Amino acid sequence: MAYKTPFSSQFPLSSSTLPLTLISLDDWGLVTATGPDTEKYLQGQVTADISALATNQHVLSAHCDAKGKMWSNLRLFHRGESFAYIERRSVLENQLTELKKYAVFSKIALAQDENALLLGVAGKNCRQALSSFFPTLPDADNAVVAHEATTLLHFSLPSERFLLVTNTATAEQLTEKLQAQLNNSEQWLALDIEAGFPIIDAANSTQFIPQATNLQALAGGVCFKKGCYTGQEMVARAKYRGANKRGMYWLAGSASKIPMAGDDLEWQLGDKWRRTGTVLAAVKLNNDNVWIQVVMNNDMESHSVFRVRDDEGHSLTIQPLPYSLNEEK
């Protein structure tokens, strides 16, 4: 099978029904950060504690503006002697420009890596299938492993899967020999929605503080004990003064159309429908089920009913996320 990305589009499947699948992640991009001041610089820019990030771990963190609103969220990890992060391609250029604003005063180089290829491997027996290509695979305890030109990231949610930062030669070999079905970024997006990992595309950049997208519920995503970083005051206020009234939800059901990032939905109140929320991402699955990731008021009743705007005869309901939103005070 010839290697050519993006792989042809198939309707995504849920993690419970997904066969072994190799996924081209063309909707995501990679940025590298190198130089002696890299750790210190990133520590002053993102919500995670970069100084505590082990070489065998990755973390979903946020890069905020001065008001605590996220330019984007970043999947940060060590790559060789440097740091790297993955984010949605639609926000990458603007986010990187913002991150570079004060870099002139530090010994750090920030650049998009156009040569690296991003692939996902997920579905049934994905660990077993990958083990014939790499001598060591990451797991929950050692979530980042490097082998030659490839860095492998492990994810436990919604079920075991792997993200590979690699080169063309390895991608060609995997495409040819993995004996997996192929799919494009929509499949990985569906798995991220199921996992409760917030998706920030361009339409929602600088719209939400991290807690509105549940980032504080993901291990290491927001550190409230580290030193100053851009937007810290607003992020801390949301926690300690209860200023955040929003949360991120996963909705599932039927819809005749797929909403776009930035769209609102409708919430059923008696026999009326009221506009609510902001869509982060949405996908239609192979069984016609529609999944939507949306930010709404964080006091929504679990039995609430929603729909895409003006989508009569269809409805969506709240699904349980695989993590707790209860915070330590």
Curated annotation (Swiss-Prot):
InterPro entries: GcvT/YgfZ_C, tRNA-modifying_YgfZ, YgfZ/GcvT, YgfZ/GcvT_CS, YgfZ_barrel
Predominant place of localization: cytoplasm
Cited Gene3D superfamilies: 2.40.30.160, 3.30.70.1630, Aminomethyltransferase beta-barrel domains
Pfam families assigned: YgfZ_barrel (PF21130)
Cell compartments where the protein resides: Cytoplasm
Residues that coordinate or bind folate: 28, 188
NCBIfam families xref list: PRK09559.1 (NF007110), ygfZ_signature (TIGR03317)
Protein purpose: Folate-binding protein involved in regulating the level of ATP-DnaA and in the modification of some tRNAs. It is probably a key factor in regulatory networks that act via tRNA modification, such as initiation of chromosomal replication.
Protein name as annotated: tRNA-modifying protein YgfZ
Species annotation: Photorhabdus laumondii subsp. laumondii (strain DSM 15139 / CIP 105565 / TT01)
